[in-house]
Amino acid sequence: MYYSAGTYEAFAHPEKPEGVDNKSAYIIGTGLAGLTAAFYLVRDGQMKGERIHLLEKLELAGGSCDGYRDITKGFYMRGGREMDNHFEVMWDTFRDVPSIETPGVSVLDEYYWLNKHDPNYSLCRASVNRGEDAHTDKQFKLDKESAMALSKLFLTPEKDLEDKKISDVLPDSFWDTNFWLYWQTMFAFQRWSSALEMKRYLCRYVHHIDGLPDFSALRFTKYNQYESMILPLVKYLESHGVRIEYGMDVKNVIIETEGNKKVAKQIVYVKDGQEQTIDLIEDDLVFITNGCCTDTSCYGDQTHAPDLSKVKNGAGESWDMWKAIAAQAKHGEFGNPDNFCSDVDATNWMSATVATSNEEIIRHIMNVCKRDPRSGKVTTGGIVTVKDSTENWYLSWTINRQPQFKSQDKNTVLVWLYGLHTDREGNFVKKAMRDCTGEEICREWLYHIGVEESRIGELAATACNTTTCYMPYINAFFQPRKESDRPKVVPDGAVNFAFIGQFAETPRDTIFTTEYSMRTGMESVYTLLNVDRGVPEVWGSKYDVRELLRACYYAVDKKPIDELPLSFGEREAVKLLLKKVKGTDVELL
């Protein structure tokens, strides 16, 4: 497997890999990583669909990319997905997946046209004083010490950041900047999150620095992620004969190591309460989704808080499977799951979905976001962060294009919100978020969008239906780590197995993205089948001097060099540099 850039490799069709007709594939998990692996087995690996088996524990494909309607409880959306124009593997995939809504076009075409006609941007990034615009005004407000520390982090080798927290490398003044407000709430980082991962994010999205304050860097799907991404991919695979076998609870993959050679020999699973096995030969390829950020999700509804009785450090079936596999490693080459799943207090947050058609509430929504949520177009343009709640639940909320579900009534608006601090009291509701019913969480949100206090109780109870989800491991992949804590996509010496998903290690890309999962799926197939075509490299904006200079300009809020808070020595050095480059192409840059 090798990386490439440019259209020569991107537009080429690889030859059929040698021996593929004798091979079969077993893919554990039907999240984006597993579905993408199946896609590349079909399209580029040219494996017959009948020889590809997706093993899924649940009754629905999609993994963490879900979105569904419970007939009795309402709509559930655990999370949302923000996309980038340089998700190279994602767009390489969806350019060949047919739309299930618009005949004759691809999912990429449909998505491209939508975001061209209705580009995303926010008119209110944060609120204060119960619904007033906080006027962050696209400013980062970085002080000199914070700006220098970010620059140093950008340039620090990953090896030097292993097992370090963000708080280990950035000054206290950084937490009060708009940069951190944008960053933390957009990506769900915490102060104790991995400094290594923050460096990757800085490098990966340096070309989007100017679009972070108002989300103009982002693109969104028309409907929820399940209907817009998962369903078309599933239908594509099914049309090629790929089988999804539901109710398959995989417990272990038995791997034998002889010298430097590692071979998957057996899959152990439970179906209908009975433990069973699948024996494997070297021509049987196994793709393992190790770990899951939504494992042990706990659901609540309008009148019930989520039941957290089963939540404890390390508990979860995806972790149990990974631990069973990791225990077979001779030198830790299958990763260290305990690094990610052993501190629920650090890795949890909670989301909620509010459904309403109440005109009074919608007027308050429009007062904040300056748009009509029932227009069918961009509404909030990304999350609105409630600055007043930073020491409480730390709420952010968003309304994507409506309807979010094809079955959604045209008068109903779905609001998604989340809180980073589930153990703290709310500003209005004096309970920990995780202990609250949907109705109580709705009250807190109504309070922050400016609804009169005397009206909040009645509206939350009768004009809204709120479902909730507490996710103990949703930030697990942000835990400080070293390179060996996640197994390589294809470990050294592995003959017929690979690790895929958010807890597999691939260089340069960032977790908590659709692209990361899909990239591991593509890389795993290309490696095990030796597909002779380049995997598109992670977009290299960090190597583009134009993007770096542009990012510096926006990071200091577009101040000219002579207005920056520089010391006398620094100013003199800048003057000398500008004199040296005068009349050159560097000056033009």
Task: Label the predicted regions.
Residues V42-R69:
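Glycine-rich FAD pyrophosphate-binding loop
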Residues M1-A25, R43-R51, A551-L589:
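Extreme N-terminal leader/targeting segments of oxidoreductases
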Residues V206-T221, D283-L285, N290-T520, Y526-G540:
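C-terminal segments that line or cap access tunnels to active or ligand-binding sites in enzymes
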Residues T72-W113:
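Conserved FAD-binding subdomain of flavin-dependent enzymes
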Residues A37-E50, Y236, H240:
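A short, Lys/Arg-enriched amphipathic alpha-helix followed by its capping loop at the start of a domain
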Residues C203-L285, T289-G291, T303-H304, S309-V311, ...:
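Helical element adjacent to the flavin cofactor pocket in flavoenzyme catalytic cores
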Residues I100-H207, R219-F220:
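Rossmann-like flavin
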Residues G29-L35:
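Glycine-rich Rossmann-fold phosphate-binding loop(s) that bind the pyrophosphate
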